[in-house]
């Protein structure tokens, strides 16, 4: 007698769990296809981890590993850039010489751009120190073409107070006064960026 696994699956799991398993199942298959089995396991571990620790991925066609924090939003950022490839439409643009990355995070988008635009230079702005440290580590092999400014983009130059609202390392609450980490700001107009002169 053959088991009807679909019926067992439908009867034993509530619909919300079936939905979640379907979503994660598709994501894991896509991660495995795009990144390889070991990287997909590491990425899934990063998504499910309850405590923060450092992990690395060795991506196909990238010479150095990509470092990220397991148990934070870093794994979602890695997935968006390297598996979902949200920036792929931009690679159709030709003759790119200069890129500004406002919110460099841990450097995934910058790494993607450096790979796809080999003649471009990039200036990234990232206010959070832990993110900036990982950014530098991830972009070490492109250090001659990448410039990092540890500041926040704002409408005027001032000091802001950043507070991390949760384990998401890509979102922060911002105020001009407060008791959290003090971050200096820059404006695009005051950065005086040109292709010949970088800050």
What are these regions (language model features)?
Residues 1-199:
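Phosphate/nucleotide-binding beta-alpha loop and adjacent structural elements of enzyme active sites
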């Amino acid at each position: 007698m053959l088991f009807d696994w679909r019926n067992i699956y439908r009867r034993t799991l509530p619909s919300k769990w079936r939905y979640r398993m379907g979503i994660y199942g598709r994501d894991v298959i896509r991660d495995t296809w795009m990144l390889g089995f070991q990287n997909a396991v590491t990425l899934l571990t990063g998504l499910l981890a309850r405590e923060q620790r450092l992990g690395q991925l060795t991506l196909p066609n990238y010479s150095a590993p990509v470092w990220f924090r397991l148990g934070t939003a870093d794994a979602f950022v890695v997935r968006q850039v390297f598996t979902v490839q949200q920036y792929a439409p931009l690679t159709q643009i030709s003759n790119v010489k200069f890129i500004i990355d406002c919110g460099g995070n841990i450097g995934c988008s910058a790494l993607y751009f450096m790979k796809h635009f080999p003649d471009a230079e990039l200036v990234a702005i990232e206010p959070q120190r832990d993110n900036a440290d990982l950014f530098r580590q991830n972009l070490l092999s492109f250090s001659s073409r990448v410039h990092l400014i540890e500041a926040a983009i704002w409408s005027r130059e001032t000091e802001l107070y950043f507070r991390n609202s949760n384990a998401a390392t890509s979102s922060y609450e911002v105020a001009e006064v407060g008791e959290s980490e003090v971050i200096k700001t820059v404006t695009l107009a005051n950065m005086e960026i040109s292709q010949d002169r970088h800050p």
